[in-house]
A protein has these predicted regions:
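Catalytic-pocket segment enriched in acidic/His residues
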Residues: 1-139
Length: 139
């Protein structure tokens, strides 16, 4: 299976952690004015500001409005620049997440989401499925 859609990887079981609580819109005066940081094992990997995002929340809502929204829906806005997938092959080898790593995503006024990285075997109790081939690689 191949996919040119980067977000496809985020739709796999267990790949959308939320919580331990959800902050509602009335608790955030301006969602485009929040400091954001991502750390792996305490090392800052990404740091930016929600005002620098390439797509605004109203644009996201508009783009997906044909799907319809219901009370309780969660809007995922993506991440700030600096993801490992767009680094050099040497940097990717060092930066890609490995079992045992701890990820901390922090957004000002919302909190810190902290999650450990576990192997497929540890998380599911079965062997991992075949890997999806990277973009441009023949099947």
């Amino acid at each position: 299976m191949r996919s040119g859609v980067f977000s496809f990887c985020k739709a796999i079981d267990t790949f959308c952690p939320l919580g331990p609580w959800i902050v509602t819109p009335d608790e955030i005066p301006d969602p485009h004015d929040l400091a954001m940081e991502l750390r792996v094992n305490g090392e800052r990997r990404q740091q930016s500001h929600s005002g620098r995002m390439s797509v605004t929340i109203p644009q996201i809502l508009s783009n997906f409005s044909a799907l319809g929204y219901s009370a309780g829906d969660v809007l995922s806005t993506g991440t700030v620049s600096g993801v490992a997938g767009f680094k050099s092959p040497e940097e990717r080898a060092r930066l890609y997440l490995k079992p045992g790593d701890v990820i901390e995503a922090e957004i000002e006024g919302i909190g810190v989401l902290r999650n450990p990285v576990v192997s497929w075997q540890e998380g599911h109790g079965t062997a991992a499925p075949p890997r999806i081939r990277p973009w441009g690689e023949d099947v």
